[in-house]
């Protein structure tokens, strides 16, 4: 067992990624200066598997430029408070891309609070996994927190993409702008990632003229965001569930969808 010196800072939801190419363990988390405070930035630690010791540890504060870019609304100071780490993509040289999404809920029963969301509200059992973790989507379903799906509205907004070197220092940042919400469940919200042509393609639903269109925005290695034409279904009535999608080859991704209460699968080729 090993301990990490957090220098009197607070972190939540540590994400562990195994780098088999470089024999490293990569640890990432958002951090705070005080308990229940605002998210200040990103904590990154790199542990070497061969020597069994810490190689680097950094607390990287997020400046006003990143906060202004990431926020949906509200002051810059609290801009990152609703962001959760979703993906970490490793590169051969040990650097990586970290992807976080703006997520929160609204309910008549309880107010939203990041700390309560992660570690449990006194009136809700911490063993209720759907409440405890923002990543427990279930199998094509997610029950409401309060046994009443209609009382919960889910919000999935901007996606923050951070390019970082092999010690966790920030090199560049980009944002995919989106606004998504739904009542009762979040099966059709969030995004999928498709790596094709040296770019990260983000696929997500967006409501346009009462029709859910599967949008495609791509991010290049330099951080440039390109808005591509929507992937319009040839047949009406199909609603995609991109969060459950799976890339199956260098040019193909399988996306589950719903059609007249049936689950089916669409194959998208690049």
Label each PLM-derived region with a short phrase.
Residues 1-114, 147, 155-157:
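Beta-propeller domains
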Residues 2-16, 54-86, 170-192, 221-250:
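Conserved blade-ending motifs and adjacent loop-strand segments that build the rim/top face
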Residues 22-35, 45, 87, 94-106, ...:
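Short beta-strand elements that form the blades of beta-propeller/WD-repeat-like
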Residues 36-37, 53, 107, 170-171, ...:
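Intrinsically disordered, low-complexity acidic/polar segments
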Residues 39-53, 117-132, 144-169, 215-223, ...:
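Beta-propeller blade signature
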Residues 92, 259-270:
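Terminal, non-catalytic domain-edge segments
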Residues 114-118, 179:
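Flexible, surface-exposed loop regions and adjacent strand-edge segments
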Residues 126, 130-145, 163-206, 210:
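C-terminal structural cap/anchor segments
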